[in-house]
């Protein structure tokens, strides 16, 4: 039996095997958890994240990954042999955490804070890119307030400029 939901959330809830498609072609197939944890490309990562995955342009320069105008961190071992240049970073909202959680510090003005059940979805700007943080409980941020966050870059997904996932 094949069930073809149009909503990615339904596919995630059904579990089992899943196939993702784009323009009539299968882009990835496998167990739901595997596709979620290791999406083959940026399009799959975007579809399989709710709230949507944060995507930012970063640069590999020597032994550092740079988020221009905001932060830098050591290059993951799997990307060390890759030539310097632009990459796309994917980081799910629950990996953008409160300060003191042990990640890469970023700060920026809050654009909006929404309550979603027992969690808050906080949208904020870092160097011209909108980021989303999924935080437990009710977070009371005023629009325009400068807020501090930490990126759990150990959980980051890296993609080339064409959107293909790189080992990380």
Task: Give the predicted meaning of each segment.
Residues 23-25:
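Conserved ABC ATPase "signature" C-loop
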Residues 51-55, 63-168:
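Non-catalytic connector elements of ABC transporters
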Residues 31, 43, 57-59, 109-111:
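Residues located in well-ordered beta-strands
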Residues 14-20:
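Conserved catalytic segment of ABC-fold P-loop ATPases
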Residues 1-4, 6-13, 31:
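Conserved H-loop
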Residues 33-37, 45:
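Short acidic-hydrophobic catalytic motif
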């Amino acid at each position: 039996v094949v069930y073809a939901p149009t909503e990615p959330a339904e596919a995630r809830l059904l579990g089992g095997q899943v196939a993702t498609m784009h323009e009539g072609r299968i882009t990835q197939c496998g167990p739901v958890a595997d596709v979620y944890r290791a999406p083959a490309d940026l399009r799959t990562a975007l579809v399989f994240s709710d709230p949507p995955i944060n995507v930012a342009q970063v640069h590999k320069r020597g032994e550092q990954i740079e988020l221009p105008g905001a932060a830098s961190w050591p290059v993951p071992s799997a990307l060390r042999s890759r030539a310097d240049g632009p990459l796309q970073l994917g980081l799910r909202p629950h990996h953008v955490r409160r300060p003191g959680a042990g990640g890469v510090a970023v700060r920026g003005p809050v654009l909006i804070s929404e309550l979603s059940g027992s969690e808050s979805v906080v949208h904020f700007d870092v160097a011209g890119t909108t980021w989303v943080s999924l935080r437990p409980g009710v977070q009371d941020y005023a629009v325009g307030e400068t807020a501090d966050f930490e990126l759990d870059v150990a959980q980051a997904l890296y993609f080339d400029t064409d959107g293909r996932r790189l080992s990380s």
